[in-house]
Each structure stands twice: as C-alpha cells, then as structure tokens.
Amino acid sequence: MSTTDDTHNTLSTGKCPFHQGGHDRSAGAGTASRDWWPNQLRVDLLNQHSNRSNPLGEDFDYRKEFSKLDYSALKGDLKALLTDSQPWWPADWGSYVGLFIRMAWHGAGTYRSIDGRGGAGRGQQRFAPLNSWPDNVSLDKARRLLWPIKQKYGQKISWADLFILAGNVALENSGFRTFGFGAGREDVWEPDLDVNWGDEKAWLTHRHPEALAKAPLGATEMGLIYVNPEGPDHSGEPLSAAAAIRATFGNMGMNDEETVALIAGGHTLGKTHGAAAASHVGADPEAAPIEAQGLGWASSYGSGVGADAITSGLEVVWTQTPTQWSNYFFENLFKYEWVQTRSPAGAIQFEAVDAPDIIPDPFDPSKKRKPTMLVTDLTLRFDPEFEKISRRFLNDPQAFNEAFARAWFKLTHRDMGPKARYIGPEVPKEDLIWQDPLPQPLYQPTQEDIINLKAAIAASGLSISEMVSVAWASASTFRGGDKRGGANGARLALAPQRDWEVNAVAARVLPVLEALQKTTNKASLADIIVLAGVVGIEQAAAAAGVSISVPFAPGRVDARQDQTDIEMFSLLEPIADGFRNYRARLDVSTTESLLIDKAQQLTLTAPEMTVLVGGMRVLGTNFDGSQNGVFTDRPGVLSTDFFANLLDMRYEWKPTDESNELFEGRDRLTGEVKYTATRADLVFGSNSVLRALAEVYACSDAHEKFVKDFVAAWVKVMNLDRFDLL
C-alpha cells in the first residue's frame, strides 16, 4: 500500500496521524540544517559558553571562591585518596599515582600552540569527545574517584584545577618535587565546539607527521593525545616514531629535552593495562547505556577490573618501583636488550629479554615480571638526538628531575596565559619565557595625563584610520584559548609582530607614537597605542554626530625583546584577519570561516563581530589601505553606511575572477561599479544569521545604538589581556 493510502486510511478511521509510528518527536531531533548544507558557516561557534549554560551565574567569582579554600586540607585529602583503593576500580599496587598522572597529562596534552586551543584550562575532559577518546579509556574512573573531593569542596576548586592538582599531588606522593602549581582554571559547562580535532571519521586514523605542521592538530592519529604507542600506524618501529613524537610535542611548544623528560617522567610511574583482547571492552561513556551513569568501557573479561583491566591493550610496567619516583626508566632502557612481543591483548610492545623478573605484579606480591616498554619508549634510545639527552639523564638523575619538573609545569600550565592569571600558594616566583612575561609598571598616568596625551595624539597628524588600525593591530593578537597575545606589552613594536605583513600600518604609526611616549614620559607605549584608538574612535563618532567617551583603563606595560619568544609569537601571526580584510593564504578554509575563527579567538559574539566589522570598514582600516568593503562616501565617519549599502538592492554583486575572493558591486541600472568587496564583507549579506544582525544596524533608528555597540565591543578587545585588572 502506498504512503498516500496509509494516510488516507488513518484519517478515515479517525486516528490522529501524528500520534502514529516511532518517529523521534523530541526537540532537536530530525534532519538538521547542517545535514542539508554541510558547509554552512559556523556562526554558532560565537555563542558557546554563554551564561545560559552556566549554573553558577554571572556574579560567580572563581578567584574569590578559591581564596576561601583550605588548600592544605585539599591536598591532604588528595594524598589520602591515592591509597584508598576502591573495589569498583582497584588501585595498582594499592596506589592511584599512575592513574592521576595520566588523567592530568591527557587533560593538558590536547593543547596545540599553533592556534592555542585545547589544553586543561576549562576541564574539557568531562565532555565529549575527550571523555570518550580511545586514548582516555578508564580516565572516567579517575574522575569518578575525585568526585567525593569535588563534592566536599564545591565551587572553591574547579574541576579543571582539580584534575591538574591531583596529578601534581600524585607526583609529590611518589617522592618527586614538583616545580609548583598555579590555580585559576575556570570550568565551562559544555563541550568546546571550536577545537578542530581533524577530519577523520574513524578512530586511530593515521596522519603523516608533516601534515601536523599545516593544521592545528595535536596528535598523529584521531583519538590519541600524542602518538600511537605501538609506532606510526601500529608499525612497531621505534626509530620511525621519532618524527611523529617531535611533531606532536613540538605542536605543544616542547623541545627535544622537554619531550624526553615528559615521556620518561610520565612512564616512571604506573602501568598500562591490556589483560585481554579489546573485544571484551564495551561502549565508551558517550555511547554507554543510561544506567552506566557516565562510566564507559565496561569489560566482560574476568572481573573487568584490577588484574583483568583493559585500557590501552598494552600491558607495560616500566620500572621496579611503579609508585615511587626513580631513575629506573633510563637504567632499564639502556641496560637491557629489548625484543618485540605482544601483550595479552595483542598490542605490540617490547620486553627486556635478558632482564631478571624484577617488576612487581600490581595485585599479587608473590609474582614478578620482566621490564616492558612501549615502542615509543625505545625511540628515546634509538633516535640519535633523543639518545644523547636520554644518556645525559641516565648519568645525571638530578638533571632529569629538574627537566621533568619544569616540563611538567609547562605542560600543565601552557594554556593558562600570563602568570597574572595564576592563583594559589604554590605559584613559582620565577618568570618563564613561555609565560610571555611582562615587567613591572613604570607609569601611573593620572586623568589629567590621559587628557593631555589624547590631545597630543590628536595633534600628531595621524589619521583616524591610522590611529584605529594601530590599536587593533596591537590588541587583536589575543587568543582566548591560551590567553596569549593582546595589547599589554606593546609587542607590536617588537619582533616578530612589527614586521608582519598584516601590520604594515605599524611602520608608519609607531615612530610617531614612540616619539610621543618619549617626549611626554607619562604612560607606556602600550597604553598610548590603545589610547590612539580611543582618540580615533571618539573623533569618528563625533563626525557622525554622536558624542561618546570611549572607556580607557591605563596600566599596560612595555615588554622587552628578551621577554619575547620570537618563535612562539610567530604562531600568533594571522593567516587571515577579516576585520582588516587580510588574507595571506587561500589554501586554508574559506575567508568567511576564518573570520569566524578570528572572532572566536577574540571571544566575540556574533553581534560584536558584526558591529566591529561594519565600523572598521567605514573607518578605512583595511591592512593595505584598499577600498574593499568601504561602503561609504564619508570614510572616517563612524556611520552605519556599511550595512545600509550592503543591503541596498540597487547593487548587484559579481566576482571579479574565478577565485571568488573579490567582488564588484554594480548599479543595477547603470552598470557602474560602485563598491568592491571581499568574502569577509559580503558574508554579512549572504549568511542568514549575519544578515539578520546586519539588518539591525542598517535600520534608520540604529545609528546611536551602532556607535555604542561598536565602542563596547572595541573596548572588550582592547582589554582582553588585562589580567592585571582581575
């Protein structure tokens, strides 16, 4: 019978057709827009982590709550937990030391220096996909073990901080002296949607190490934190893994010494678990049934826990004292001959064939086994450069301890940004170059000083476009992921930023502002750069008939060149900045997607992005001085002309060539070219969400609102890195 017949039959019997069948009628079910249009612009990325998802409310102050924490008592509770073995997940050798170190490592290890995303800073290991990654098997148990402590201390300690602190306490409990701990990681309440984990659709899909340099990916296989411990694509070859190891650790900003220290230090304690084949392992937490209550990977092998546990499928114990810190990793690495073998689960690993049975069994004191290692552990012996470092650590355990302490601190704090964000009693005093250190303030400009400086800037001969452009160039390097970049430090005046193509305006404007700073000696160059933007915007608003005072918070400082890691700051150079109509490469995504990416890094909402682009276009802030997107006959006036003319049906847009990157807007009647535009301009008329926002500012009653909204969004960007104001 046809569908029509079925419907007719239902109606004729008086039954409601909408109450029949098993279709999912819940909210959000059914075919979504992205199913129809998979290339749909991800404007939604700008609306994540809003107050609507935060149960703590807008007034919650984590730094204030943390100050109430009994930090010593918390660490005491964590220490006690380490040896409080639970029957539902028994501790190896009666200690959770290795488990908690792995939890902290895998939380922090998703960080990628290329785009600043990932890392432990927001407690993302609680959410998909990380909570169910193949490399994170059994870390659901670690987080569940921590729950009674989190429940006890409540909002005085975030999950994000607790994960890392638990790893630190585990190291300390093993007899290791850590470098310190900085709290300040604030939880979010939903998964990060902006992190690009890769295009692969299957877990453990292999990537060539060279590809990692071209994309913001942290691992050589989908679903891993770093590299495949069995070698690239399960090759079992230690030497071939060297390139993959360097690529992944290098993407976190680690050099060879830090890489060796982290691998060896992380594998000095604990074990891997591979009691039987992976076919015994059930669904991950996201796919597990509701009664599992967020736990996954239930095993049908034996008891499923303890000696029967299956995690990675590898069954490796590296050292003779797996719950106490030692130098046995390097001693065993070089002392014995290693033969490739397989774990009970069938995974490739190595065994010390000429070693006695010196490794204690985790659950039976009467049993011992030979030392075992991962394929990638042996890379530290057989790669020539790694081998040199490893032998030095073998012969100088104190050098190894110092290197691991510093590398572990860097690993677990790399995405926290400047040290001004750190809180707690164990923050190290030493400034580290990867923290982008800043000097102490030299100036405290008064309100009178600021008024005089603004007058001097206004009289300097700089145009509105130049003043606004230089301020944006200074502040817009900020990345919300790892809190790097921004205007504080005036690193626009230093290498490498001063020489970036996108910052061409700096060559013209900075000499003027630097001379003014030296002459007045009342404020830092960083403050004067931002103040120039204030002057430019106030002039542009006044020209539009709106009198407005742009808020300005002095107190920025000027970094020195020796406080600036040129290689690491080079990663902040944009491949595109749609706010300035800049694009360096055409082989990476679309121009409009890169605009969204930039706005998301700047923590902007969709309305904030919209108003900033519209305002900057009419102020003529394109990086190269082009007229693309400058839809106005009165540049330098903070008007709504960009929106009004973009949405004006008098103009018809067509690409100028096959690249579809540059467009001409012609008068439909005369055929005359009126405007030119890029994709970063036209997207505000083509994308339905952005067009809806553009229409707000194109209305006749929107002018004053536009100016106020522009100023608010502008000030937000200028202050993104003002952690000294927290």
Swiss-Prot record:
Its cofactor is heme b. Coiled coil: none annotated. There is a cross-link at residues 105-226 (Tryptophyl-tyrosyl-methioninium (Trp-Tyr) (with M-252)). It comes from the Bacteria. One of its GO terms (molecular function) is heme binding. It catalyses: H2O2 + AH2 = A + 2 H2O; 2 H2O2 = O2 + 2 H2O. PROSITE patterns: PEROXIDASE_1, PEROXIDASE_2, PEROXIDASE_4. The keyword Metal-binding applies. There is a cross-link at residues 226-252 (Tryptophyl-tyrosyl-methioninium (Tyr-Met) (with W-105)). The active site is at residue 106. Residues 1-33 are annotated as: Disordered. CDD domains: catalase_peroxidase_2 (cd08200). Binds 1 heme b (iron(II)-protoporphyrin IX) group per dimer. The record marks 102 as: Transition state stabilizer. It is an enzyme of class 1 (oxidoreductase). InterPro entries: Catalase_peroxidase (IPR000763), Haem_peroxidase (IPR002016), Haem_peroxidase_sf (IPR010255), Peroxidases_AS (IPR019794), Peroxidases_heam-ligand_BS (IPR019793). Its EC number is 1.11.1.21. GO terms for biological process: cellular response to hydrogen peroxide; hydrogen peroxide catabolic process. Heme b binds at residue 267. Bifunctional enzyme with both catalase and broad-spectrum peroxidase activity. PANTHER family: CATALASE-PEROXIDASE, HYDROPEROXIDASE I, BIFUNCTIONAL CATALASE-PEROXIDASE. Homodimer or homotetramer. Belongs to the peroxidase family. Peroxidase/catalase subfamily. This is Catalase-peroxidase. It comes from Salmonella paratyphi A (strain AKU_12601). The gene is katG.
